From Swiss-Prot:
GO terms for molecular function: ATP binding; medium-chain fatty acid-CoA ligase activity. Involved in the biosynthesis of petrobactin, a catecholate siderophore that functions in both iron acquisition and virulence. Catalyzes the adenylation of 3,4-dihydroxybenzoate (3,4-DHBA) to the corresponding AMP ester, followed by the transfer of the activated unit to the phosphopantetheine thiol of the aryl-carrier protein AsbD. ATP-pyrophosphate exchange is inhibited in vitro by nonhydrolyzable acylsulfamate analogs that mimic the AsbC-bound intermediate 3,4-dihydroxybenzoyl-AMP. The gene is asbC. One of its GO terms (biological process) is fatty acid metabolic process. Disruption phenotype: The deletion mutant cannot produce petrobactin on iron-depleted medium. In vitro analysis show that mutants grow to a very limited extent as vegetative cells in iron-depleted medium but are not able to outgrow from spores under the same culture conditions. Disulfide bonds: none annotated. NCBIfam families: PRK08308.1. InterPro entries: AMP-bd_C (IPR025110), AMP-bd_C_sf (IPR045851), AMP-binding_CS (IPR020845), AMP-dep_synth/lig_dom (IPR000873), ANL_N_sf (IPR042099). Coiled coil: none annotated. This is 3,4-dihydroxybenzoate--[aryl-carrier protein] ligase. PANTHER family: ACYL-COA SYNTHETASE, MEDIUM-CHAIN ACYL-COA LIGASE ACSF2, MITOCHONDRIAL.
């Protein structure tokens, strides 16, 4: 069925665990109720998802590192009747729950990078459809082994990395060991692999010397890879892949062979995309799926290679009526040797209004970085201020919240 780090779980292990859940008191009347899962062991999460889905229950996934009190509050807000925290035997019953007449669903909170996290609900029937069309679009051989470095408490690691693999008869390897050398050894010892990771993990893996080793397939998602990291990985990878999606829709598109770090590929069969083809005038990516229209708030355009990402609508900076896309400015700074990381965001000026601000991890003087930008960008795109920092804060999936950076600027 699957492997967690180096521990293998068979079909009989799966069945024994499901039978154990049958006997637990909290699951005797599971149908129609919501359960929150904040668990450390991927095998616990996956087996409970299978079990509760079969019981026609809804499941709220919460990242394993969430403190218990916070996780309980999240479960209460989601109207769950209880939460399993840490281990599958640690169940906390929650009171004052209103009965919900809903189709059994998978529940998740959005990342909150652009504001307060929202509770997203997707029916299990929608998840089943996603798995079916995802496997069709992925067109992966059964003997290609998914190595899942993304958490299974998130739909990317759970649905795309794990459930889709089990459905097509593959045996995924889920990595929770925090040592990047451990993960790299697993990859190197698995000839036909497809690595599921986010840019932060790939950045760490890419920092180790590869020698003559060649990655088979790397799948990235969650945020665009920095341009320099993309080209570095592409040199040692047979197929650089990227999938694009959102909490409301799941996976929307897959790119099988990236030519640029912003390539999102073609839509899955169950999704249709409304978007323009002018690179200089990107539009919001609007997805039609299951008789509903999803406004992603992502900007992009389409070409013969498929979809291309340009940025978040919320992140676009309006400098005296001219639009600045943070990704373009970040890429320019990252092309300067010695700039390790860069994040560009909106600042406020009492007279000028919106301005471009940046934080960088670099030993180079910010004045020199600004001079570099002036040589390669129109003046209105050049950061008004560049701050040198030792760390750029990221959330658990490796995303940076420009909104929080902006709010920090406003309140100081």
């Amino acid at each position: 069925m699957l492997i967690v780090n180096r521990e293998e779980y068979s079909k009989s292990d799966f069945d024994l665990r499901l039978q154990a859940y049958e006997e637990m008191e909290q699951f005797q009347e599971a149908a129609g109720n919501r359960f929150a899962l904040c668990l450390k062991d991927p095998f616990d999460i996956i087996t409970l998802v299978f079990f509760l889905k079969e019981k026609k229950s809804s499941v709220l996934l919460i990242h394993e590192d969430t403190p218990k009190e916070t996780a309980i509050e999240m479960a209460k807000r989601a109207n769950c009747i209880g939460i399993l925290y840490g281990e599958n035997s640690d169940f906390t019953k929650l009171e004052a729950v209103n009965y919900l007449a809903e189709e059994p669903s998978l529940l998740q909170y959005s990342s909150g990078t652009t504001g307060e996290p929202k509770l997203i609900r997707r029916a299990w029937t929608e998840v089943d459809t996603e798995i079916k069309v995802y496997n069709e679009a992925l067109n992966c051989d059964i003997d290609e082994v998914p190595i899942v470095m993304a958490p299974v408490s998130h739909s990317y690691g759970l649905i795309c990395g794990t459930l889709s693999a089990i459905t097509r008869g593959s045996k995924p390897i889920i990595i929770t060991n925090k040592n990047p050398k451990f993960a790299l050894n697993i990859v190197r010892n698995t000839e036909k692999h497809i690595v599921y990771a986010v840019p932060l993990m790939l950045h760490i893996m890419g920092s180790f010397p590869q020698g003559t080793f060649q990655f088979h397939k790397i799948m990235t998602s969650g945020a665009p890879l920095p341009e320099a990291l993309f080209y570095k990985l592409k040199e040692t990878t047979t197929y650089m892949m990227q999938q694009y999606g959102c909490s409301e829709a799941g996976c929307i598109s897959i790119c099988h062979d990236m030519k640029s770090h912003l390539d999102l590929g073609n839509p899955l069969p169950h999704a249709s995309i409304s978007i323009g083809s002018d690179e200089n005038a990107p539009e919001e990516i609007i997805v039609k799926m299951n008789d509903k229209e999803i406004f992603t708030k992502d900007l992009g355009y389409k070409s013969e290679r498929g979809l291309h990402f340009m940025g978040r609508m919320d992140d676009v900076i309006n400098v005296s009526g001219l639009k600045v896309f943070p990704i373009e400015v970040e890429e320019t700074m990252l092309r300067l040797e010695g700039v390790q990381e860069a994040i560009v965001y909106r600042g406020k000026h009492p007279v000028m209004g919106e301005i471009v601000k940046a934080k960088v991890i670099s030993h180079i003087d910010p004045v020199q970085i600004r001079e570099w930008c002036m040589q390669h960008l129109p003046s209105y795109k050049v950061p008004h201020e560049i701050e040198s920092v030792t760390e750029i804060p990221k959330n658990k999936t490796g995303k940076v919240s420009r909104k929080l950076l902006e709010m920090g600027e406003v309140t100081t």
